Amino acid sequence: MYSNNLICDILEYINKNIYKEIDITSLSNIFYYDKTYIMKKFKKEIGVSIFDYINRMKIFNSLSLFQYDNYILNIALNNGFNSIEYYSEIFKKIVGVNPKKYRYFVNRSKYITDREIDIVIDNVNKLNRLDIFVKRYLERRRPTEKMVKVLGIKKIK
């Protein structure tokens, strides 16, 4: 079964522009579909809302930076969040702990409990599964017929 071409186009656009501000009005204007239709179709095909997907992918992309960057503010700004407060709010909602606790997790610190470790592992696995699902969804895109120009080549004797 093939994936929906509109949703594939939207996913590709979001993935290319993940660090920019993306809103439903701009998606509607870019793809020439009604906002409500896009939101319903996306949720039906992917299983999460467009904005939930965007936030989850921004957070997912930011996780690897905790090993290298000392400042959570830099991680937030480098992943398309305008403030550390909003980043921390979304991070805790998605990962299950705040960014500081996640840093403890990454550094295998004694300041994170076993329960928090289990929560982090479970939620990071969910993010990974969503990422894999979307990649496979895009691979199942219906092939488009491409115009092939036939060139007439003459033999030179």
What name fits each language-model region?
Residues 1-2, 89-156:
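…primarily DNA-binding HTH/wHTH and HhH modules…
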Residues 4, 8, 12:
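Glycine/alanine-rich phosphate-binding loops at beta-alpha junctions
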Residues 11-16, 21, 25, 44-82, ...:
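Terminal helix-turn-helix DNA-binding modules in bacterial transcription factors
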Residues 30, 34-35, 82-84:
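Short coil turns linking two alpha-helices in DNA-binding domains
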